[in-house]
């Protein structure tokens, strides 16, 4: 089992990086859906989003439960899972939880970054996200824990009045009389991918710090309390969440594109390019990395495009990235959209570190080397990255918070 690339970071650095990775995962849709609207229209974009999340979230939810040893079938398990879900990154999607008992709970969002992103687009887009997408995808997430869980709105946008707080509120109830929620067909397809079944190193229980989430549900996760080993595992799991979301996105896009494989590849490459650049910028800024070839090498080692190690086989050094045929290629994951004929995503990463860094790729589509060189000519930020930065999440800043227990052990 290859050593995680995240293991090179200190515990303090990992505590900074993990919430960044969760937020980056949320921004994947900000990158991809604009191109889906342009090609298929708003209604099909909504269906792509539903299939994308419902096709993968039960898989990665169960993976994180197993990794942090909080597997169960109750409300507390559902809420813990949301705290490590790229669909609900901390603070940007500010979930506040209330547990009445094991089978009854509520949550509301004091701040919904996704809502603030779509409100300027008008009520149709708000309803599309907060009704059409949320209804099936909330239940899909809950079904990973208990198929008889139902997530239902108390109130939700469009907001009346326009400044209503909290942004939305929901009940979560598990009742044996409820019909079992049914998975969508895409879930069975994604469950067979290499990413879904990728094995990561177990967390060393003797490492200094918290090794699991077996204790009470916390109001806010204190990532700094986790051990180095736990944070490494969480970071790799979050990267797998992103790969699974993308694989589900690719499946949904291919379904609409049909025989037009060039269209599907174009949409998915644009989506990758946008999130690749934004992710690189956030990683560099969060860890205060230098804007040079050394900083770029570190960004590449930590970038979700190239993680977990082993799933993507790569050698990284200042000025050079070499990629070999990988399990991720077999899945058709992000790395399959990079290579000799497709430098856009790697250039977006380099530009985010320093606009003067230019990339040149040689080799085949699965076995290639990218060389980075600093020149006097500064490249402009790509349109794909600019589109992704329409989201407030691209510039969102995390705040320090106290972590308080909400439930007894």
Predicted region positions:
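Gly/Pro-enriched, hydrophobic low-complexity segments
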Residues: 139-140
């Amino acid at each position: 089992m290859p050593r995680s690339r995240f293991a090179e970071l200190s515990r303090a650095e990992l505590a900074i990086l993990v919430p960044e990775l969760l937020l980056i995962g949320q921004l994947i849709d900000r990158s991809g859906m604009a191109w889906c609207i342009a090609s298929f229209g708003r209604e099909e974009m909504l269906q792509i989003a539903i299939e994308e999340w419902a096709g993968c979230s039960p898989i990665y939810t169960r993976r994180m439960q197993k990794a942090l040893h909080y597997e169960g079938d109750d409300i507390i398990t559902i809420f813990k899972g949301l705290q490590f879900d790229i669909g609900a990154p901390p603070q940007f999607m500010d979930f506040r939880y209330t547990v009445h008992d094991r089978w009854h709970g509520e949550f509301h969002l004091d701040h919904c970054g996704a809502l603030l992103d779509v409100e300027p687009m008008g009520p149709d887009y708000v309803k599309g996200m907060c009704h059409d997408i949320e209804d099936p995808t909330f239940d899909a997430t809950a079904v990973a824990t208990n198929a008889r869980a139902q997530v239902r709105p108390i109130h939700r946008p469009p907001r009346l009045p326009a400044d209503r707080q909290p942004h939305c509120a929901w009940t979560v109830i598990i009742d044996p009389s409820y019909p079992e929620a049914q998975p969508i067909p895409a879930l069975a397809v994604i469950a067979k991918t290499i990413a879904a079944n990728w094995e990561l190193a177990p967390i060393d229980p003797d490492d200094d710090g918290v090794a699991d989430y077996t204790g009470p549900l916390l109001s806010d996760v204190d990532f700094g309390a986790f051990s180095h080993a736990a944070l490494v595992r969480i970071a790799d799991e979050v990267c797998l969440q992103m790969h699974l979301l993308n694989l589900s996105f690719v499946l949904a896009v291919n379904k609409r594109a049909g025989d037009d494989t060039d269209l599907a590849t174009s949409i998915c490459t644009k989506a990758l390019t946008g999130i690749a650049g934004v992710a690189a910028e956030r990683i560099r800024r969060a860890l205060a990395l230098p804007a040079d070839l050394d900083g770029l090498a570190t960004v590449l080692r930590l970038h979700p495009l190239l993680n977990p190690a082993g799933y993507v086989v790569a050698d990284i050094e200042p000025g050079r990235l070499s990629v070999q045929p990988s399990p991720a290629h077999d899945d058709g994951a992000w790395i399959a959209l990079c290579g000799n004929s497709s430098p856009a995503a790697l250039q977006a990463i380099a530009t985010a570190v320093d606009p003067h860094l230019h990339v040149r790729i040689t080799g085949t589509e699965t076995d290639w080397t990218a060389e980075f060189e600093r020149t006097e000519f500064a490249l402009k930020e790509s349109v794909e990255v600019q589109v992704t930065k329409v989201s407030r999440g691209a510039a969102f800043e995390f705040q320090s918070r106290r972590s308080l227990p909400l439930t007894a052990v």
